[in-house]
């Protein structure tokens, strides 16, 4: 039958793709890929895209409760976020981003290593729910959205991994997030310092390669009389294990935390302490160690 307005698109499906004619599958795909498009999508009389893309709005137009509701929607939780970062950039590429710091890290509860829950969009259309390389490894606890109009809508996962735009987006987000941490450390230090510290995961001299631990677990393993958390930054675990600074701490049985990601040193400087234990970089000149105990003969 003729339409008064608009366009009718008829799709003929092969037998092996019959599932895409099922109502539940069509709604699932619409909500997954087009949940935030600007125009209303109706399916058999049901309004599908009911959640607003608040990341595309100005911060002044978004209420605090809207941030909380959006975080709960994308992270499937009833909790409010610890903090959020909402920003736009137009150089070197155009993007809108809304990132949330959760109150707790799933890795704390034995769920193993988690992937970042930050989705990549182009003009509010989902490109990849978990794009590789979008965030550095140390930011994998984040939840949120990154939307760039400069990305092609038909870009594949393989192209994303080698795309220079994604690397530029990663650099922008990392720098912005470090500034955000710096602001929290200065303006709301007591509120956020301990919580941020508990989100971090790292390898150490007490873990096998690839196995991570937390500051809380580190503190339970501290030797009697040890007053500080010892840490070392570098490009890789292998590099750190060969550090000349490490020998004196291993000789005294002190665990040393390894941080190998971009921005780690800045984050540790902002953190300063966890549970009243100062985080001390072992390659600094002012580190004091007790004398080694000598064997009684």
Regions found by a protein language model. Name each.
Residues 1-297:
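Conserved GHKL (Bergerat-fold) ATPase module
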């Amino acid at each position: 039958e003729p339409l008064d307005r608009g366009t009718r698109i008829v799709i003929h499906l092969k037998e092996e793709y019959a599932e895409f004619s099922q109502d539940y599958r069509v709604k699932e795909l619409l909500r997954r890929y087009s949940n935030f498009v600007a125009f209303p999508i109706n399916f058999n009389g049901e309004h599908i895209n009911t959640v607003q893309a608040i990341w595309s709005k100005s911060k002044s137009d978004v209420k605090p409760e809207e941030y909380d509701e959006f975080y709960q929607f994308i992270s499937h939780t009833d909790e409010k976020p610890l903090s959020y970062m909402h920003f736009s950039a137009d150089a070197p590429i155009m993007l809108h981003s809304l990132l949330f710091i959760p109150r707790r890290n799933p890795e704390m509860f034995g769920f193993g290593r988690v992937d970042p829950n930050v989705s990549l969009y182009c003009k509010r259309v989902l490109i990849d729910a978990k794009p590789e390389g979008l965030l550095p490894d140390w930011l994998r606890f984040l939840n949120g959205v990154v939307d760039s109009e400069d990305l092609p809508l038909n870009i594949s996962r393989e192209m994303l991994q080698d795309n220079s735009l994604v690397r530029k987006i990663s650099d922008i987000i990392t720098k912005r997030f470090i500034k955000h941490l710096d602001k929290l450390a200065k303006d709301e230090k007591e509120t956020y310092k301990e919580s941020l510290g508990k989100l971090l995961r790292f390898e150490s001299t007490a873990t096998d390669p690839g196995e991570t631990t937390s500051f809380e677990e580190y503190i339970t393993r501290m030797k009697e009389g040890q007053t500080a958390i010892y840490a070392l930054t570098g490009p890789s675990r292998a590099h750190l294990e060969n550090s000349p600074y490490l020998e004196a701490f291993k000789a005294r049985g002190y665990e040393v935390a390894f941080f190998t990601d971009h921005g780690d040193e800045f984050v540790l400087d902002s953190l300063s302490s966890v549970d009243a234990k100062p985080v001390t970089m072992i390659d600094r000149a002012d580190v004091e160690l007790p004398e080694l105990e000598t064997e009684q003969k």
